[in-house]
């Protein structure tokens, strides 16, 4: 959680808010099929439903009130993965900063799976 203090009080933003914003921003990028999570039992990556997207996002809080975000995504075939990754980074950084006022130190994108067809 990050606390934003003002002269009239404070606002605390929970981890769930950051994961929802980041997951939604990433999933809405062109060529992203969705967020993925790795199954502990079989080691296979599974596409997450919209309501479970936070499982494909990890948020780390730093002492200087910045955050780092790790995203695990599935992309479509035939795309430039580097370009998609950079678009995700830009979109997630913008959305998190504009919605919460929190500075994003890093956005790390892991393309864990590809969807053919």
Question: Language-model segments: which ranges?
Answer:
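Contiguous, often N-terminal, cationic amphipathic patches that form binding interfaces
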Residues: 1-77, 81, 86, 98, ...
């Amino acid at each position: 959680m990050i606390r934003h203090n003002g002269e009239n009080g404070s606002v605390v933003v929970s981890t769930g808010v950051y994961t929802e914003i980041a997951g939604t921003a990433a999933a809405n990028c062109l060529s992203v099929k969705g967020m993925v999570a790795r199954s502990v039992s079989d080691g296979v990556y599974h596409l997450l439903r919209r309501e479970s997207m936070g499982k494909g996002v990890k948020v780390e809080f730093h002492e200087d009130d910045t955050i780092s975000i790790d995203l695990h995504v599935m992309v479509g075939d035939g795309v430039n993965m580097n370009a998609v990754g950079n678009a995700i980074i830009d979109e997630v950084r913008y959305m998190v900063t504009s919605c919460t006022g929190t500075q994003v130190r890093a956005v790390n994108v892991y393309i864990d799976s590809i969807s053919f067809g």
